[in-house]
Amino acid sequence: MAAKLILFVCATALVAQSALGIGCGCGCGGRGYGGLGYGGLGYGGLGYGGYGGGCGRGFSGGGLPVATASAAPTGLGIASENRYEGTVGVCGNLPFLGTADVAGEFPTAGIGEILYGCGNGAVGITREGGLGFGAGYGGGYGLGYGGYGGGYGLGYGGYGGCGCGCGY
């Protein structure tokens, strides 16, 4: 009975870690295939200072840009109880979706008109600006190939050929 309980607790912990955890690569102590070896590349991608692929980049502000802004105004109103004679023009842009209403009496000698347009016919976000360029070294030859691994590697097998610790 105790073995079943231990198996259940370990399986629950494994499921929770695989669902909620961040995979930082594999390997022994940051070496081998999950770290600095394998021709200067990390775990299936770019080694990031001894970490495996994807470790520490999503939550440290490096590769996940986030932009926030205040909420758009929910309404825009123009109200007047004055009497205007002549041509009156009101011009502006309403955010995303807007309505226009004219209330009151128009004399038969004048005209009242509302011109309403919505860009190209689609109501929604029409343009999003980029966040600029990310910080990093833009060397023409790159930093990964022949970096720390460089054909000798840091595997546990001494000077293994590819650095993954397997001795090849």
From Swiss-Prot:
Region described as Right arm (Gly-rich tandem repeats): spans on this chain: 129-168
Region (4 X 5 AA approximate tandem repeats of G-Y-G-G-L), start-end ranges: 32-51
Sequence repeats: 32-36, 37-41, 42-46, 47-51
Pfam families per the UniProt record, alphabetical: Chorion_1
S-S pairs: none
Cellular component GO terms held in the UniProt record: egg chorion
Keywords: Repeat, Signal
Signal peptide stretch: 1-21
InterPro entries to which the protein is assigned, alphabetical: Chorion
Central domain, as annotated region: 60-128
UniProt GO molecular function: structural constituent of egg chorion
Biological processes, Gene Ontology terms: chorion-containing eggshell formation
Span list, region Left arm: 22-59
Stated family: Belongs to the chorion protein family.
Biological role: This protein is one of many from the eggshell of the silk moth.
The name this protein goes by in its record: Chorion class B protein L11
Native species: Bombyx mori (Silk moth)
